[in-house]
Regions:
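Glycine-rich, aromatic-lined ligand/substrate-binding cores of catalytic
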Residues: 267-344
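C-terminal motif of bacterial Sec signal peptides marking the signal peptidase cleavage site
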Residues: 31-32
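Short internal beta-strands
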Residues: 117-124
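Conserved anion/nucleotide-ligand pocket segment
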Residues: 224-294
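Glycine-rich, charge-decorated loop segments at or immediately adjacent to ligand/cofactor-binding or catalytic sites
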Residues: 128-133, 202-224
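Glycine/threonine-rich flexible loop motifs
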Residues: 175-187
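Conserved functional hotspot residues or short segments at active or partner-binding sites
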Residues: 314-414
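Glycine-rich oxoanion-binding loops at beta->alpha junctions
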Residues: 136-165, 178
């Protein structure tokens, strides 16, 4: 049948011997469904479902209505693959951000009479109401009776038993495009478990609010942890779907396994598209400004400096009781999403970054850390969790550079070679121009 620019179903994947039979069957099925198909072998083991089928698949749920300029998320385009979910046992990896307009992904799938057998929950839990770093317990969802299996408790990777009654895993979580945000690590382990157990995985892509730039030191293998598993900069300029393609294509899964991966990409979106998240992705990233400042302020998490956890402005301020007197002060207290905030009940002199006119960062601002270092003087008073700081930075060099009094310009100059090499790798997996 004839394809058109605006009305076709395009698949993009790399020749992979073990999946050749599966791919052939897939193409036959797509042809039988009267869909236009184009094949491009370029992403190892991964299939990217690009454009619209000729007609909407009819199901008993409201079809989202968009203007031509609205970004459409992967979750908004369930019609692209909903038929292939029928008769399958489905697990979803999701949290409070997994919404189709005002309806949660879980409720949407159940309304379509699909067989959702379990939900995997990441850091902060299924409802996003658990403080950073706190263990998430497995439980039963009281509304649906479906098991909620924690991937941030006794184990961070689905076990063989967890997947024994599952055919396909759907991943839909809003990311913020920063290496130490742990949803990336959760996705890695889910991909790895699916690869080990022969399960298919679908990633519903979402815009990255920090996709418009790339910055920071590249993570060194010795500092791999759950707050950074891959050799990428702190800000990597990719959506979570593109990142999943990179994990597969670069062989970053254990034993260089390849996950049977489908990506449902966004539409009407580029990396330069400004996208304000409708739902906070975690308890302390509550505003556009906080999400923008997160790459610059998160390194403070390994210091004695407060970045506003336990206040109304997390990741919008920074301060310390031993800073010289300032016009702006704040006092952190335990509250929702911050059960034990740094400098709790102390009066912190500091700086309110909400007064800044710039709501969108274009680089990591090292001057906040340098200013705090200079105000505190004693490096022991400043960085009190050296090993954690190195894991966040992805190396041991940055801590030494701060201790030696390096300027932001001097520090940034050491990042350039790694960033240029990463850009060459990243380019292979980009879906949006």
């Amino acid at each position: 049948m004839k394809n058109s620019k605006d009305n076709r179903l395009t698949f993009k994947f790399q020749k992979y011997a073990k999946q050749l039979c599966l791919e052939t069957i897939l193409l036959i099925l797509l042809s039988a469904c009267n869909l236009g198909v184009g094949v491009d072998y370029s992403n190892k083991g991964s299939i990217v479902v690009y454009d619209e089928p000729k007609t909407w698949i009819d199901f008993d749920a409201p079809i989202p209505i968009f203007t031509t300029k609205d970004p459409q998320l992967g979750i908004d385009r369930l019609h692209l693959f909903v038929d292939s979910l029928k008769g399958k046992r489905i697990a979803i990896v999701c949290n409070q951000t997994s919404m189709v307009k005002d309806v949660h992904l879980l409720d949407t799938l159940l309304a379509l009479n699909l067989n959702v057998v379990k939900v995997f929950s990441p850091e902060h839990g299924f409802r996003g109401d658990i403080s950073a770093g706190e263990k998430v317990s497995s439980s039963i969802d009281p509304k649906t009776g479906i098991p909620l299996v924690s991937l941030y408790g006794t184990h961070k990777k689905p076990t063989e038993s967890d997947l024994s009654d599952v055919d396909i895993v759907i991943f839909d979580i809003q990311d913020v495009g920063v290496r130490f945000y742990t949803f990336l690590s959760t996705m890695h382990f889910v991909m790895e478990a699916c690869a080990e157990n022969g399960k298919q995985m679908v990633v519903l892509d979402r815009p990255n609010p920090n996709a418009h730039y790339i910055d920071g030191p590249i993570l060194e293998p010795a500092y791999k942890s759950f707050v950074g598993m891959h050799p990428v900069p702190i800000v990597y300029g990719m959506t979570i779907g593109e990142y999943a393609l990179m994990i597969n294509g670069e062989g970053w899964l254990d034993k260089k396994l390849t996950c049977r991966l489908w990506i449902i990409p966004c539409k009407n979106y580029t990396h330069k598209t400004k996208y304000v998240l409708p739902i906070p992705p975690s308890p302390n990233l509550r505003s556009e400004l906080a999400i923008s400042l997160y790459p610059s302020l998160c390194l403070f998490e390994a210091t004695t400096v407060s970045i506003g956890r336990g206040t109304d402005q997390p990741f919008e301020v920074y301060g310390h009781p031993k800073f010289p007197n300032t016009e702006f002060t704040f006092s952190p207290k335990p509250q929702f999403g911050a059960s034990n905030p740094p400098q709790a009940y102390c009066n912190c002199n500091g700086f309110n970054l909400a007064s800044s006119l710039a709501k969108r960062s274009y680089e990591i601002n090292l001057n906040y850390l340098i200013n705090a270092r200079d105000l505190l003087g004693d490096s022991i008073e400043f960085i009190d969790q050296g090993a954690f700081f190195n894991r966040l930075a992805g190396n041991a060099i940055l801590k030494e550079q701060f201790a030696k009094g390096w300027s932001a310009k001097e520090i940034r100059s050491t990042w350039k070679p790694g960033l240029e090499e990463f850009k060459r790798i990243r380019k292979k997996y980009l879906l949006y121009n």
